[in-house]
């Protein structure tokens, strides 16, 4: 943001940083999930057990994430009180930042199979897709919209990583994720 929005860049950066501090609640949930799930899923399960548990875990992760998303988004005016008054103008980007944080957990869940199968070189492909999306959308959106563009660029980056992880999963390690139910959780949260 600092170099892409020359006029008022530090103010833009401050607003974006303040709003991401509110969204840290979602990242704390993600970290707790990661610290519990990674050792669990990387232990020695039969493939059929691993696939079933991984599919169920993603569904429940998204369900819990959507509850946290709703709790923060619906009470964003209360959460806005923890940041300075001059930073509150950017509170409208909070749902976008929260959405990006949810997607971080989704692609983590989609990555367990290649960690388990010791194909971690695929992580380079996934993060490379995220990097390309962040750079492309960042250079396009940030000069136009400032911190709003930065939030959308991050969401695009996380979406790209989820998309590539999903594609790799479908191709090399098909897992029966309940995408219909997961989509329902997301749709209900977005409607509310």
Where are these regions (language model features)?
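Transmembrane helical elements of multi-pass membrane transporters/channels
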Residues: 1-39, 100, 104-108
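Membrane-interface helix-loop junctions in multi-pass transport and translocation proteins
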Residues: 6-12, 121, 128-163
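Interfacial segments at transmembrane-helix termini and the short loops linking adjacent helices
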Residues: 8-13, 72-103, 108, 148
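Interfacial transmembrane-helix starts/ends
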Residues: 17, 45, 49-75, 91-94
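Helix-loop junctions and terminal segments of transmembrane helices
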Residues: 19-59, 111-116
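Hydrophobic transmembrane alpha-helices of multi-pass small-molecule transporters
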Residues: 24-28, 69, 105-108, 131-138, ...
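Membrane-interface junctions at transmembrane-helix termini in multi-pass inner-membrane proteins
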Residues: 42-46, 98-129, 169-171
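Transmembrane alpha-helical segments of multi-pass transport proteins
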Residues: 95, 129-133, 179-192
């Amino acid at each position: 943001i600092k170099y892409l929005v020359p006029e008022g860049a530090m103010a833009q950066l401050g607003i974006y940083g303040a709003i991401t501090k509110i969204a840290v609640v979602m990242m704390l949930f993600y970290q707790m999930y990661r610290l519990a799930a990674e050792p669990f899923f990387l232990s020695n399960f039969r493939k059929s057990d691993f696939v079933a548990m991984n599919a169920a875990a993603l569904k429940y992760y998204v369900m819990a994430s959507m509850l946290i998303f709703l709790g923060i988004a619906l009470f964003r005016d209360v959460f806005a009180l923890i940041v300075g008054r001059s930073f509150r103008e950017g509170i409208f980007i909070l749902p976008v930042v929260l959405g990006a944080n949810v997607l971080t957990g989704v692609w983590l869940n989609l990555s367990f199979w290649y960690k388990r199968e010791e194909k971690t070189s695929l992580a380079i492909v996934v993060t490379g897709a995220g990097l390309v999306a962040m750079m492309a959308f960042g250079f396009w959106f940030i000069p136009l919209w400032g911190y709003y563009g930065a939030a959308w660029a991050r969401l695009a980056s996380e979406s790209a990583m989820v998309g590539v992880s999903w594609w790799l999963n479908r191709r090399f390690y098909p897992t029966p994720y309940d995408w219909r139910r997961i989509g329902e959780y997301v749709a209900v949260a977005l409607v509310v």
